[in-house]
Amino acid sequence: ERWMECTLPIGLVLLEGGVIGVIASKVFQVEPWVLALISAAPMFANLSSFLWNKLSLAKKKVQFASYLQLGVLICLLIVALSPVIQLGVVMLVTSMIASRILLAGFVTVRSVVWSLNYARDIRGQATGQLQMIASVVSIIISASIGPYLDYISTNIAIIYIIGAIAGVLGILFLGR
């Protein structure tokens, strides 16, 4: 799981509202209401946790979590392929919202996996270490992407493809 936490956040950071918001504003030059929708996406996603709990019942949790991660990676690739036209804005925003909903499902299922993998008395410490790794990776990637986004005009595809490749590694590490 530690290796997954080193790789998966690379792709997840690229779908955060702040990053997508900058891309939507600078590259796609969207209206303010679109930026508001992007900012609200995580709140929509949090409401889906109840649904994910029901959908994952009687399913293999690690496999289910891997499918959710794969869905997030597909969203990354859709962003990479989004043309800088109105259709691209729809692809960008839809992918961002879908990825947040899928990520909410992943977080919901992952908590069940953690409860099965770690004894109650060490679970907090173990999951805290995993989250610390993910946070450090997220900070490093966010700090690295900022300057890149300042200097690009429309060439965002490469960073999203790299994020998707890192995410595939995360799926492989989770399945081990």
What are these regions (language model features)?
Residues E1-N53:
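Helix-loop boundary and gating motifs at the non-cytosolic
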Residues C6, C75, L87-F106:
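Hydrophobic core of transmembrane alpha-helices in multi-pass small-molecule transporters
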Residues I20, L103-Y118:
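Intracellular juxtamembrane helix-capping segments at the cytosolic ends
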Residues P42-S49, T127-G146:
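Glycine-rich segments within core transmembrane alpha-helices of 12-TM secondary carriers
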Residues L47-Q63, I145, L149-D150:
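Helix-to-loop junctions at the C-terminal end of transmembrane segments
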Residues L57-V72, S153-N155:
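Cytoplasmic membrane-interface "Motif A"-like loop-to-helix N-cap segments
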Residues Q69-L87, P147-D150:
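C-terminal ends and interior cores of transmembrane alpha-helices
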Residues A164-R176:
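C-terminal membrane-cytosol helix-exit motif in multi-pass small-molecule transporters
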